[in-house]
């Protein structure tokens, strides 16, 4: 199979990369009615599989789970989760032939095997759904021409998808129809009904493409969302300890610092995050972020180039074929780092202390978010898509680090995200070491003293922060998410 994106001509590539339309709430007036009375069979009962299924059932849809015979016979976790929640469970052979919509919510590396198994069992004119388009775009999976292929991609982990639905809300969602597989022209109606059934229409839905979702998703998770947080954690911890900070305190400042800092980012973008600093600290954070952007821009661009060309995907799929040798080696090495093995700090760190003593961390967040956004937009991805794949998801990933450090982040994210994270962080750490050696007192671990600032300089800096394109589009998109619950900040 050939990488689908690479089979397109340049005009088609640009058209699909640039497909992005914010859908009006009136477009979802019919809710999930298009799928009511039809049989929806979900393959996979992980975090997305279970929680999307729960939401869809609560929205009045007929939901069941198709699992492998061994999973049922051995009563594995997927079988237990589905049955304990009262769902009908059966084998592929029992459930797939009667399904109107088959939703493949297994991990990326299982998609080809799953599709090859279910496709011969699917009835004529059925639909196949994904929540990530890697199998279609990067693997180049060929789907029978009578089958409609759609995507509904919530921009949150599965647990958040469920929690927001239970609150009567939802999470921002991308939907798409594969242009090669919409024989009856009903793909958009199916995708809209599925998105409404998960609650996504209450938080904002982007009509996108499989290509735009995949390329932007890979870029965000590799760079700012996971790679930058991992590289930043390792670099900042080592710097603090090198300068005499208690390792336990240093570990806590970083582990919970990302979460605290990005909570401000979630509520009010880079503007609010920077406003949490004193004026002298804000000036310094801005200067550091500009230095970081200049240093890291070529690395961000390389990742985007490798994602666009398919170089990243081919390398990762080669590792899949080699029993994940690289991935597992990198995972083991990360677990042995000083940050991951540091003792726990039992004392309290106040919320403002994370900002005052984390000026460098704030600069890293600002630089990483802006670079990821700018690099995606320069590659033809529309600003709304770039926002969701950079700034929007960052607090959610930071929250995983607050739970169990980098280990938890790498467990929760997909194997695809984890592989890309290691590629980025392994390149970024040595790249930034000379920069780290030139830091000043107050950049990390100590507060910058209050002092006089130049009013004109501060005015211009504030204007530069607020006028960045990600702040402009972010203000609009956050307006649709005002009801989303505040992520709990650990102390």
From Swiss-Prot:
Look up the record and name the cofactor or cofactors this protein needs. Answer: Mg(2+)
> Which molecular function GO terms apply here?
ketol-acid reductoisomerase activity; magnesium ion binding
Provide the residue positions that the database annotates as binding NADP(+).
45-48, 68, 76, 78, 108-110, 158
Q: Could you list this entry's UniProt keywords, alphabetically sorted.
A: Amino-acid biosynthesis, Branched-chain amino acid biosynthesis, Magnesium, Metal-binding, NADP, Oxidoreductase, Repeat
Chain residues that bind Mg(2+) 1: 217, 221
InterPro entries, sorted = 6-PGluconate_DH-like_C_sf, 6PGD_dom2, KARI, KARI_C, KARI_N, NAD(P)-bd_dom_sf
Looking at the record, the residues that make up the KARI C-terminal knotted domain are: 209-344, 345-484
Reactions mediated catalytically: (2R)-2,3-dihydroxy-3-methylbutanoate + NADP(+) = (2S)-2-acetolactate + NADPH + H(+); (2R,3R)-2,3-dihydroxy-3-methylpentanoate + NADP(+) = (S)-2-ethyl-2-hydroxy-3-oxobutanoate + NADPH + H(+)
Q: Using the record's annotation, list all stretches that form the KARI N-terminal Rossmann domain.
A: 15-208
A GO BP term here is: isoleucine biosynthetic process
Q: What does this protein do?
A: Involved in the biosynthesis of branched-chain amino acids (BCAA). Catalyzes an alkyl-migration followed by a ketol-acid reduction of (S)-2-acetolactate (S2AL) to yield (R)-2,3-dihydroxy-isovalerate. In the isomerase reaction, S2AL is rearranged via a Mg-dependent methyl migration to produce 3-hydroxy-3-methyl-2-ketobutyrate (HMKB). In the reductase reaction, this 2-ketoacid undergoes a metal-dependent reduction by NADPH to yield (R)-2,3-dihydroxy-isovalerate.
**Similarity comment text for this entry:** Belongs to the ketol-acid reductoisomerase family.
Q: Which NCBIfam families match?
A: ilvC (TIGR00465), PRK05225.1 (NF003557)
Full protein name: Ketol-acid reductoisomerase (NADP(+))
* Native species: Escherichia coli O157:H7
What taxonomic lineage is listed for the species of origin?
Answer: Bacteria, Pseudomonadati, Pseudomonadota, Gammaproteobacteria, Enterobacterales
Gene name of the encoded protein:
ilvC
């Amino acid at each position: 199979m050939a990488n689908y994106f690479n089979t397109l001509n340049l005009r088609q590539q640009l058209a699909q990369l640039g497909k992005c339309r914010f859908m009006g709430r009136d477009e979802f007036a019919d809710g999930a009615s298009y799928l009511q009375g039809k049989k929806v069979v979900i393959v996979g009962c992980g975090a997305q599989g279970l929680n999307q299924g729960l939401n869809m059932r609560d929205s009045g849809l007929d939901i069941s789970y198709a699992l492998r015979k061994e999973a049922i016979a051995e009563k594995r976790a997927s079988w237990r989760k589905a049955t304990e929640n009262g769902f009908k469970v059966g084998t592929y052979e029992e459930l797939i032939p009667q399904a109107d919509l088959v939703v493949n919510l297994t991990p990326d590396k299982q998609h080809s095997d799953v599709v090859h198994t279910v496709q011969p069992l699917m009835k004529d004119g059925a639909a196949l759904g994904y929540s990530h388009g890697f199998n279609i775009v990067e693997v180049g999976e060929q789907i029978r021409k009578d089958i409609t292929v759609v995507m509904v991609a919530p921009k949150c982990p599965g647990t958040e998808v469920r929690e927001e639905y239970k609150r009567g809300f939802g999470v921002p969602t991308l939907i798409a129809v594969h242009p090669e597989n919409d024989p009856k022209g009903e793909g958009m109606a199916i995708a809209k009904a599925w998105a409404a059934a998960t609650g996504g229409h209450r938080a904002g839905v982007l009509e996108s493409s499989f290509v735009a979702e995949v390329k932007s998703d890979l870029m965000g998770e590799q760079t700012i969302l996971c790679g930058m947080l991992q590289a930043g954690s390792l670099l900042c911890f080592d710097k603090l300890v090198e300068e005499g900070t208690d390792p336990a305190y240093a570990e806590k400042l970083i582990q919970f610092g990302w979460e605290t800092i990005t909570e401000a980012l979630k509520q009010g973008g880079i503007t609010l995050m920077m406003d949490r600093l004193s004026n002298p600290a804000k000036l310094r954070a801005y200067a550091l972020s500009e230095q970081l952007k200049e240093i890291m821009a070529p690395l961000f661009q390389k990742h985007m180039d490798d994602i666009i060309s398919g170089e990243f995907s081919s390398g990762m799929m080669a590792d899949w074929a080699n029993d994940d040798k690289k991935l597992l080696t990198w995972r083991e090495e990360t677990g042995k780092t000083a940050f991951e093995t540091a003792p726990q700090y039992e004392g309290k760190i106040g919320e403002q202390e994370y900002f005052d003593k984390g000026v460098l961390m704030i600069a890293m967040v600002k630089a990483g978010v802006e670079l990821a956004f700018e690099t995606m937009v320069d590659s033809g991805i529309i600003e709304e898509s770039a926002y969701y794949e950079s700034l929007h998801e960052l607090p959610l990933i930071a929250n995983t680090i607050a739970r169990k450090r980098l280990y938890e982040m790498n467990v929760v994210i997909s194997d695809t995200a984890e592989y890309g994270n290691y590629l980025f962080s392994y390149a970024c750490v040595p790249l930034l070491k000379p920069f780290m050696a030139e830091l000043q007192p107050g950049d990390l671990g100590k507060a910058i003293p209050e002092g006089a600032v130049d009013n004109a300089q501060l005015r211009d800096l504030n204007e530069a922060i607020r006028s960045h394109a990600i702040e402009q589009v972010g203000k609009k998109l956050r307006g649709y998410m005002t009801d989303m619950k505040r992520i709990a900040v650990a102390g």
